[in-house]
Amino acid sequence: MQQRIERIPVADGELAVASLGDGRPMLFVSGMMGPYMSPIPANASAAMLFSFFVAVILTPWLMMKLGRKEAVRGHAHAAADGGRLGRIYAMVARPVLRSRARAWAFLLVVGMATIASLGLLYTKHVTVKLLPFDNKTNLQVIVDLPKGSSVEDTDRTLQQMVERLGDMPEIVSFQTYAGTASPFDFNGLVRHYYLRAEPQQGDIVVNLLPKGSRGRASHAIALDIRKRLEGLALPQGTVAKVVEPPPGPPVLGTLLAEIYGPDAETRRAVAGKVREAFKSVPFIVDVDDSYHNQPQRMRVAIDQDNLDYYRVEQSDVYDTLRYLYGGTTVGYSHRGGGRQPIPIRIALPKGEKVIDERALTTPVPANALPAGLGVVELGDVVSVSEQPASYPVFRHNGRAAEMVMAELAGAYEAPIYGMLAVNDAISKADWGNVPKPVIALHGQPDDETRPILLWDGEWEVTWVTFRDMGAAFMVAILGIYILVVAQFGSFKLPLVILTPIPLTFIGIMLGHWLFAAPFTATSMIGFIALAGIIVRNSILLVDFIRHSGGQGRPMVDVLLEAGSVRFKPILLTALAAMIGAGVILTDPIFQGLAIALLFGLVSSTLLTVLVIPAIYVALK
């Protein structure tokens, strides 16, 4: 017993170092998710170091000061068999450890259960999403009318939408912006909403009741808003998008396809077919593109013959057009001591700055009239024609690309499912003379001689986050393996310690399925945290077995004693973590973390104390 007591600080040190190494992966997440992830391992590592010193220094001192009488009495009998929990454990574990065949059968069943739990991802009973929707207090409705619409048309459309949504009880107020940008946040910065200042562009800011004063989350309200606006009669070609503030890094579009190709015409043709594929998927909504319909422009050309006939100077025509549509400053008001003179300007109202018959009657100075001085109408010396204007040009990292973007709502709300559905629609579509694009998942293409569809948006953030976390997690596991090899002097024993890590998926996937919650980045964080807890539990068992197996006793008795004695502290540790995780179970962002910890701890705690001894029996 004294030898075991002396081993406590050493074992605790191993556990602390293993847990510290397990939390490092989140420090190596690149991209926009990096700043969101990096504080977690830093704070967790500091807390782990602090708790280690408390456990090996402060707790024994407090026991000596406050628990002296209990320590004198002792609980030798309880420690020997683990008490009531230990006896229950022995009753359950004894049949499993009775023979190698039973141990192998148990391990096979556990392995099949782990694979079956991961099968929930394949069957889509558990979906994958980087970050769930948060419960915010405001939403946005972004509206784009056809090019050439006036500010009045835009404002009229916004008011129709407000009237349609006005009876929703969760909405406190609306703020409408026609022809100008609303105050933008981080999401608006990334999506360039601050540049929305054209007459056909509008924005509605929907302010909601506080979270505690309404029964629905903001995401459910957004779905309701989108459904109500579907039946509204809008001008043909109008695009309306319901935008929710993202809980994590904002992107240009949740589902974003970038089309690369040899020339602009090919890119737009391919993008048009891709947009049709987007619209064919029921759960893809708010479909839009970066180029829209080809805009028209009014071209004012000077009639040189009439210019010579009326002896009108070109500069006079240009000055007239500039004054007509840009206004002019005729003087300054020097009130207030002249420190800040106020310009006196003559300019048309914004709504009247159009090229029509009235504008063409504007006088222009002429010298060919009787008496040598006079004026002619602007329409006498210019001709006006409507011509197609150039498409807007979008570039990503300096390379021209057309973009098709959309949101997801309904059966699936993660980009991976929209991507799979669109890829399937693209493969089944009749492309005719339009070249079919090659699908790329990551990285801009090197060869643009043929059309290429690159998936971006939330998928890019998801790919980078899970790739970096997964790779760093593998490195962390390798580091833990090396640490345990150095401690125990064995290459096989660390494999036994690390084997139960996948067992957490049994509880994690079942928990997400029961709560109908997606497997998110916070769920992945929970899995990483659980891996550290599993390693701690495994080291506790293996360390006890190693120091109890050299006394000539049967292996099964040693394994049962190790499980009986260690089961109670392992269970108490799990319960403490589960109580802490239960607090965030209702949080929309960290629900995945809470589910992973709660249900993963249940499955891993109950199975680890059986799997480790079963591996010893199976491989003895």
Residue ranges and their predicted role:
Residues 76-129, 257, 466:
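Signature of alpha-helical transmembrane segments and their immediate interfacial
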Residues 1-24:
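Alpha/beta-hydrolase fold catalytic core
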Residues 31-36, 71, 110-147, 189-191, ...:
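Transmembrane helices with small-residue packing motifs
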Residues 140-142, 204-226, 256-260, 342-345, ...:
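A short beta-strand structural signal in non-transmembrane regions
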Residues 30, 479-566, 571-587, 599, ...:
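Hydrophobic transmembrane alpha-helices and their membrane-interface caps
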Residues 153-250, 276, 305-327, 334:
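Solvent-exposed, membrane-proximal periplasmic/extracellular interface segments of envelope transport
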Residues 268, 275-476, 485-488, 556-558:
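Extracytoplasmic/periplasmic membrane-proximal domains and adjacent transmembrane bundles
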Residues 35-77, 204, 503, 537, ...:
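Transmembrane alpha-helices and their membrane-interface boundaries in multi-pass membrane transporters
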